[in-house]
Amino acid sequence: MGARASVLSGGELDKWEKIRLRPGGKKKYQLKHIVWASRELERFAINPGLLETSEGCRQILGQLQPSLKTGSEEIRSLYNTVATLYCVHQKIEVKDTKEALDKIEEEQNKSKKKAQQTAADTGNSSQVSQNYPIVQNLQGQMVHQPISPRTLNAWVKVVEEKAFSPEVIPMFSALAEGATPQDLNTMLNTVGGHQAAMQMLKETINEEAAEWDRLHPVHAGPIAPGQMREPRGSDIAGTTSTLQEQIGWMTNNPPIPVGEIYKRWIILGLNKIVRMYSPTSILDIRQGPKEPFRDYVDRFYKTLRAEQASQDVKNWMTETLLVQNANPDCKTILKALGPAATLEEMMTACQGVGGPGHKARVLAEAMSQVNSVTVMMQKGNFKNQRKTVKCFNCGKEGHIAKNCRAPRKKGCWKCGREGHQMKDCTERQANFLGKIWPSHKGRPGNFLQNRPEPTAPPAESFGFGEETTTPPQKQEPIDKGLYPLTSLRSLFGNDPSSQ
């Protein structure tokens, strides 16, 4: 880390740590951002030592700028970091990243105008490309330097390891910066495996070449002396054109960037291959119940890079699906953060969710709540179980007969008779009808005890004799004897009305 962090001196490092990441934000650049940028440059086969000077930062910006439109968020972040570092090297006072980008754009516009003015003054307004691999030699001639084996090795290694994952496209764009169609074909021919993907790429290139020929028909008539013929689709693809013709088109006035056109066709075909090698839709990316939030975010953004959609649609997918497809634990935390939360805040809040430590903490909180509720219920039940006692001797509440100070009541407390105690009382409790219940004979007490049975007509009307049924007047003494007053004595004690 020490070698990577040595790109800034003491004073420059102080200025670096005062620049904010976003306008009006609290977070500022730190030393770790330089370390991260150097690692990303190594991943893209770019020398991280270029970060030590302003000229090196300018070269890095020149290679990364064409990839901003089709690149990922990592390339954009890398470009912003290098642009801010360039301003620190140039001693340009900036407050945040946006201001640094504005300064870079302003400086680029000035350099373009200056180059155009210089070309106009010298009588040569041709915009000569200074990008590798077409360079200008000491005699002022534009010559081509073949693509280096190191670049080819980096490209082959990426294809073998990543197998046309979404990060292959920005890697190809960075390695093929300023390349001619011949260099691009060399890069494609070095891919040994994945011939099915290579065949799909060739079909896409043929389709784009046919579309180019349709939109750019050949002009009739001879070509004027000193002028080059217009390139056809096969010329752009490098199959019917020589290296000198390709260099001539790219350095002509006005130039025809056949290398950039061919690279766009290849990137279009690579997008189709990436979509085929990544069949998983972004809608199917869901966080597992025990999956860390960081791994879920990595899978989400990797699949999002393979989606063929505009940046606005991708932003909507990120804002909506990232929270919607999280597991219930993380979803609760993310909804509490609100819709304006940054990705860093989300990952910090969900750190450790789903692991054994988080599960143990949630279980401990749940158990503590259950225990507190149980204690409260037990205390409440204990209070409710305290009933007021009543004395059988005096009938007052607050004490029992054992501790009663009143004169002891004579006789049984149940039946009122003397000679025995309540525990030895053999008299059974009478019900509200005055009967001893349960009755082992007769009808139940709540039924009519003496139901009149239907009788036949008088005997004289049928000639059966003079005897008739029992007159109903004789039933009165029976009815009167159904509820004897003596039975109420066991229920209400000595009834004065019965005496």
From Swiss-Prot:
Region called Interaction with Gp41, residue ranges: 7-31
GO biological process, one term: viral translational frameshifting
Motif (LYPX(n)L motif): 482-491
Zinc finger (CCHC-type): 389-406, 410-427
Segments of this protein annotated with the region Interaction with membrane phosphatidylinositol 4,5-bisphosphate and RNA: 14-33
Region (Interaction with membrane phosphatidylinositol 4,5-bisphosphate): 73-77
Pfam families membership: Gag_p17 (PF00540), Gag_p24 (PF00607), Gag_p24_C (PF19317), Gag_p6 (PF08705), zf-CCHC (PF00098)
InterPro entries noted in UniProt: Gag_p24_C, Gag_p6, Lentvrl_matrix_N, Matrix_HIV/RSV_N, Primate_lentivir_Gag_pol-like, Retrov_capsid_C, Retrov_capsid_N, Retrovr_matrix
PROSITE patterns in the record: ZF_CCHC (PS50158)
GO MF, one annotated term: zinc ion binding
Alphabetical list of Gene3D superfamilies matching this protein: 1.10.1200.30, 6.10.250.390, Human Immunodeficiency Virus Type 1 Capsid Protein, Immunodeficiency lentiviruses, gag gene matrix protein p17, Single helix bin, Zinc finger, CCHC-type
Transmembrane segment boundaries: none
Keyword Thylakoid: no
Region ranges (Interaction with host AP3D1): 12-19
Chain intervals for the UniProt region annotation (Interaction with host CALM1): 8-43
Residue ranges of the region described as Disordered: 106-128, 438-499
SMART domains given in the database record: ZnF_C2HC
Lipidation (N-myristoyl glycine): 2
Span of the annotated motif Nuclear export signal: 16-22
Domain of life assignment: Viruses
Comment block on domains: Late-budding domains (L domains) are short sequence motifs essential for viral particle budding. They recruit proteins of the host ESCRT machinery (Endosomal Sorting Complex Required for Transport) or ESCRT-associated proteins. p6-gag contains two L domains: a PTAP/PSAP motif, which interacts with the UEV domain of TSG101 and a LYPX(n)L motif which interacts with PDCD6IP/AIP1.
Similarity remark: Belongs to the primate lentivirus group gag polyprotein family.
Additional comment: The OYI isolate was taken from the blood of a healthy Gabonese individual.
Protein name per its UniProtKB record: Gag polyprotein
Species this protein is from: Human immunodeficiency virus type 1 group M subtype B (isolate OYI) (HIV-1)
